[in-house]
Amino acid sequence: MQLTPNKFTLKQLFSSSNEQFVVPGYQRRYAWGKKQQKALFDDIDLLKEDDNHLFGMILCHTGAHTGGLNQSEVVDGQQRLTTIALLLLAMRNKFKAIEMNKKVEEIEGLIHCTDREENILQKITLGELDNPDYKRIFEDSTEEEVVNLNLLNGYHFFSDRLNEFEKEELLSFYNKLINVAVIIRLDASFARDAYKLFESINNRGLRLSPTDLIKNFILGHASKIDQNTLDQVKELWSSVIINLDRIDTNQFLRQYMCMVLGKRVTMDKLVEIFKHYYVNNVKDTDLISSAELYTEEVEFKDEEDENGYTNSEDEDQDELEASEDIAIKTKISIVEFLKGVKEASLIYKKIRLREFDEPKINQKLLNLQRILSFPSYIFLLSLFQREISMKDKLSVLRLIEVLMLRRHICQKRTGELDDIFSQLVSVEDENIVNLVKDRLKEDLPSDEEFEDYFPHHIFKGKLIDRARYVLEQIEYYLINDKGEYRLSSAKEVHLEHIIPQVISTKKAQKEFGDWVTYLGNNAVIKHKKYVSRIGNLTLLSGELNIKASNNPFNCKKDNYKKSNLKLNSSLANHYRQFKFQQVEERGYELTKIASKIWRF
């Protein structure tokens, strides 16, 4: 292993006019936020001129030195290096603003490099996703077009902090930044050495994400095969990262493995299970050492996804054995394997962003998102790779919609859902609708249970969108819609609380009327129990909502009568008053309808 560790000041690190640091496309986007940016800035600011401060380390894969442009691939440390670049850009523009032109020229020399033809280039280039944004900031051009706000916000944070300095403070900070603080640079001549070092170095520092560990494992294996394979693997992994832009790659890989194995995989076990499955199914894995297969016991924090799910329950299953049981008859190449991952990532993107060509599919996916059906994506990854009819796909999505709504309403354990949808992957294409229905029936709450829970279900917080979905579906049922009618967006049609959400404050009484007196004894206590139930909710246009919110129920009725929705006409015509008893009555009426809508 040929390694060259060196300690540099930033001035020394960026001194070579023909070296360019390249953050490869397979790396994730720039992700540092204000917390990390502030820590870096404060570390420099608090330094004394005779102190030493270690920025950290960067790991580079370097080729043979030439007389032209030498590109060093940043294998590790891209977040820190990019942050330093943003700080230098902010300093350049600050010096420019106060007309310290020599300092401007000095920084220009640090942030630029030249090729053999003397073309002036960026000293640091980012991956395909981030470099257009970085270039806009670098060239001080249109900020409105910047997509990655971490880059833009970082630049503005540094600019704001620098603007607080007097001239002498600014010069002192600049000197400490480029001449006092140091960074360790570790160069590896061979790609296999760089990827091997990457994981071992980070095991002693900040914990890597499962995506980082899996990426490094795959690149390390590819580097041991040949350069052509490594180049193809880098390109394929870059495509995966691009496909999953703004999507949690850790969750994609976890759900992908659930689909492949047909069993639940937790985030804690993801890397280990992936490695074992990979070794059993990909060619040339005899090149991988046992040390590379070993995954240090690290407890990955089970962060909630946007739908509120975690995957930390039921840890007693032997997931590792499952990965060893699933092995294809003939091993495939690493390139073929990654082509499969790339295809799955594209489908996952279409699922998450609702980007299929068929609008009806996208509408069903929106319904699932509003219900909060994240675990179902395990099976949907499989479903959308199947050669089955559009009609069958829509029918299967409808079955999942019914299952998820009923289970949520009946407060069934979410920890069971990964198992349910992982096992569903094994159903055959032929007669798929009936097969899925038969499987899901086992986990579907009964009519009796659903009707017992539905009128008392609390729709608030993250569940507001679920309430809107439920009321929309009831409205479609009431008008006997055949899929041709769609309510306006949430911006135009809002969720309306018939009894207002707040009734006891002076502001609420002034704005909404004296609901406390109107509702009678124990109004405030009962209000908390009833206000977020389905019986107290309806849909109303923005204009009507504003008017209605300023009136007691009798005045609200006048506005409900003006609404084109069946929900509101029945509400206005059926109820002379609307108190807690009426919330219960209406809840039971809507329950009867719901039981007919959400059934197999």
Predicted regions and their residues:
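Short helix-capping/linker segments at secondary-structure and domain boundaries
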Residues: 94-98, 205, 224, 385-393, ...
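Active-site-adjacent bridging/hinge elements
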Residues: 11-18, 51-68, 167-175, 344-358, ...
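Secondary-structure capping and boundary motifs in well-ordered enzyme cores
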Residues: 72-80, 175-178, 186-193, 210, ...
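A cross-family structural signal marking well-folded subdomains
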Residues: 211-214, 221-475, 597-599
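Generic hydrophobic alpha-helical scaffold/packing signal
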Residues: 198, 381, 397, 401, ...
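Glycine- and hydrophobic-rich flexible loops that cap the catalytic core of alpha/beta enzyme folds
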Residues: 2-284, 550-599
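Short, amphipathic alpha-helical segments that act as regulatory/interfacial helices
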Residues: 41, 85-88, 198, 377-384, ...
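Betabetaalpha-Me/HNH-type nuclease active-site subdomain
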Residues: 42-70, 426-568
